[in-house]
Amino acid sequence: MNDTIASTVRLTQYSHGAGCGCKISPKVLEKILHSDMEKWVDPHLLVGNETKDDAAVYDIGNGIGIISTTDFFMPIVDDPFDFGRIAATNAISDIFAMGGKPIMAIAILGFPIKLLPPEVAQRIVDGGRFACRQAGITLAGGHSIDAPEPIFGLAVTGIINTDKVKKNASATAGCKLFLTKPLGIGVLTTAEKKGKLKAEHQGLATEVMCQMNTIGAKFAEIAGISAMTDVTGFGLLGHLSELCEGSGVRAEVYFDKIKTLDGVQRYIEKGCIPGGTERNFESYGHKIGAMSDLQKAILCDPQTSGGLLIAVDADSEQQVLEIAADDSIELFEVGRLFAKEHDSPILITVL
């Protein structure tokens, strides 16, 4: 099989899930990660999994921290090269979400060798290699297995000054919430998988998913950004609820300010809602105030390689907007943080 034939393979037909939408639901994941074993605390581990942050951070001394993360999933698009590029971009994003700089990656590949020829896998890995080059790092190795469905991703190592780490559990009341990418990736990729995506929307989600969140490293220099995380498989409300829970704050989300990819509402009306949307809502819906069906479909939509969600204090807002503009990133406000009401289980109100 040559590259031309490889590019005609519809990878999404070989997987039951798609991108970050195939994540195990937050509710089930919590049960999996629960342990009765005595916890061993490493004083050098600055960020672990207690707050469900994007990556782990380990203090190696002299004010330097190592960031470690891994992310992989099944095809979200049909083209093998694009799949590899998206999966790699998504994995590298976790380093930027902590405010760090990636330095190296290794690949994770699962491939159905009896169903698809190796040329398809080669294109997937090349896509990953391309994304790594964009991030200024080397794809230094990896591991592969024969699997029933295609799987690809990276384990990524990064570096950061320990006093610059941006966590998802350090947000403060009064901050505005901004997002760097529009929502609706799960909706558009579901429309593509169902064969309902219009010609004018072909490649739109791919373009957004391939945008590298490099600006996260610049945001690390701004003390007035009290928290940062990337929005991926649990949707905006899922990752925002983790931020609120870990930080002891509540949020208001302004739905009329939410930006979505072109055509999202139309595809929602046609039933192009990924299964991950309902799984997400079932996991954290009890923490969210009343919503319309449209609000739920957009705000719980699982994103793959989504944007950075940042909490910004008033004094730093202009600086943040200027840095984003210099990188040709259109930040948009999605809400605001407030002191938590201790007698209410609701963390997020959608207005």
UniProtKB/Swiss-Prot annotation:
Catalytic activity: hydrogenselenide + ATP + H2O = selenophosphate + AMP + phosphate + 2 H(+)
Known cofactor(s): Mg(2+)
InterPro entries named among the record's database cross-references: PurM-like_C_dom, PurM-like_C_sf, PurM-like_N, PurM-like_N_sf, SelD_I, SPS/SelD
Disulphide-bridged cysteine pairs: none
Gene Ontology molecular function, alphabetical: ATP binding; magnesium ion binding; selenide, water dikinase activity
Residues noted as binding Mg(2+) in the record, renumbered to the chain: 54, 94, 230
Cellular component GO terms, alphabetical: cytoplasm
Highest taxon of source: Bacteria
GO biological process: selenocysteine biosynthetic process
UniProt cross-references to Gene3D superfamilies, sorted A to Z: PurM-like C-terminal domain (3.90.650.10), PurM-like, N-terminal domain (3.30.1330.10)
The protein's Enzyme Commission number: 2.7.9.3
Site annotation Important for catalytic activity: residues: 23
Residues annotated as the enzyme's active site: 20
One Pfam family of this chain: AIRS_C
Keywords recorded for this protein, A-Z: ATP-binding, Kinase, Magnesium, Metal-binding, Nucleotide-binding, Selenium, Transferase
Binding-site residues for ATP, renumbered to this chain: 23, 51-53, 71, 94, 142-144
Free-text cofactor note: Binds 1 Mg(2+) ion per monomer.
Assembly: Homodimer.
Known function: Synthesizes selenophosphate from selenide and ATP.
Family: Belongs to the selenophosphate synthase 1 family. Class I subfamily.
Protein name stated in the entry: Selenide, water dikinase
Originating organism: Pasteurella multocida (strain Pm70)
Gene: selD
